[in-house]
Amino acid sequence: MDKKIILAIESSCDETAAAVVVNGREVLSNIIASQIDTHKKFGGVVPEVASRMHIEAVDSVVKAALLEAGISIDDVDAIGVTYGPGLVGALLVGLQYAKGLALGSKKPLIGVNHIQGHISANFIEHKDLKPPFVSLVVSGGHTFIVHVKGYRDFEVIGQTRDDAAGEAYDKVARALELGYPGGPKIDKLAKQGNKDAIEFPRAKFQDDTLDFSFSGVKSAVLNYLNKAKMKEEEVNKADIAASFQKAIIDVLKTNLFLTCERKGIKKIAVAGGVASNSCLRETLLEEGRKKGIEILFPSPILCTDNAAMIGSAAYFNYQEGAVSDLNINAKPNLKLGER
C-alpha cells in the first residue's frame, strides 16, 4: 500500500491543533494547544479571544507536530485543514496558515469538514472499521445521526433543531454553578444522584423524523431551579444533573437505535466531545449488547477537537481526488456532505 503522509491543522473553535497522520489511520503526532483555561473565566468561548490565541499558537503547534513525527514539510504528501463548520475567525487562522504552507511547499491543500473529522476519529481508533455504519456525532456545537455510506458519502438522518446536546450541558452546568466546560462536571456530579428523581421532558417530533430538540429539557431544568429559588427550597444538584443527563441520553439512544433498525445496520461509531461521557458510553454499550449491535468509541483524546481526526478525513478525501484550490474560504455553517 502506498504510504501517504498528511499534515493536518484544526482551529474551528478553542483548540489550536496540528497532527501528522499516515494513510488515515496511523498517528505520528497529535499536538493540541487548548484555550480552555482562558475561556473558563468567561463561562464559554469568546470568538475574538479564540481567534487571537489561534494566531499566537498555530505556527509553533504545526512545527511541534512535524518535530514529534520526525519529518519535515518535504516528507508530507498533502496538507489537510478544517474549513467549517465553526467560528469564522477561528477557522480563518488555520485555513490561511495552511494555504500559505501549501503554496510555499507546493503541496496539495485538502479542505475538511469538521463533522467528517469527528466521524473519521473512529478510523484511527478502530483500524479495521469500514463503511457502512451509523455514526452519532455529539458535541458542544453539533448533534447528528449520520448514515456513513462511504468515506466521503454521508446521509444525515437526524440533527438538532435548536441547542446541541453539549450546549445544553454547558447551559445547565452554568445554572447549577458547576463551571465551564459543563459536560464533564455534570457527568461527574450525576454519579452521586438519582437519575429517576425528576422527570424532565424528552422532545419527540410528530413528523416521524429522528431530529433532536434539547432546548425544552434545558428550559425545564432552569424552570425547576427558578421555582425552587422562589420558594426558597433546597435543591439536590446531583439529582438534577443525573435526571437531566438521563433525559438527554434517552433521546440520543432512542433515535440512534431506531436509525439502525430502519437502515438494517449493526454497527455504530460514536464521535465528538460528548462521546467521552461515561453515562452515554455505558448506556449505548448496554443497549448494543441487548440488540446485537456493535458500539465503537474513540479514545477521549480523539473525541474532543484534534487534528489527527482531520488528518484521517483529509487522507480519504485525497484518495478520492478531493483536492481544494487556494481560493477555498472558511464556511462557518458548512453542511456535512456539502461540496
From Swiss-Prot:
Its cofactor is Fe(2+). It comes from the Bacteria. It is an enzyme of class 2 (transferase). Substrate binds at V137, V138, S139, G140, G141, D170, G183, D187, N277. One of its GO terms (cellular component) is cytoplasm. Pfam families: TsaD (PF00814). Fe cation binds at H114, H118, D305. It is found in: Cytoplasm. One of its GO terms (molecular function) is N(6)-L-threonylcarbamoyladenine synthase activity. It catalyses: L-threonylcarbamoyladenylate + adenosine(37) in tRNA = N(6)-L-threonylcarbamoyladenosine(37) in tRNA + AMP + H(+). This is tRNA N6-adenosine threonylcarbamoyltransferase. Its EC number is 2.3.1.234. Binds 1 Fe(2+) ion per subunit. It comes from Clostridium beijerinckii (strain ATCC 51743 / NCIMB 8052). GO terms for biological process: tRNA threonylcarbamoyladenosine modification. The keyword Heme does not apply. Its main location: cytoplasm.
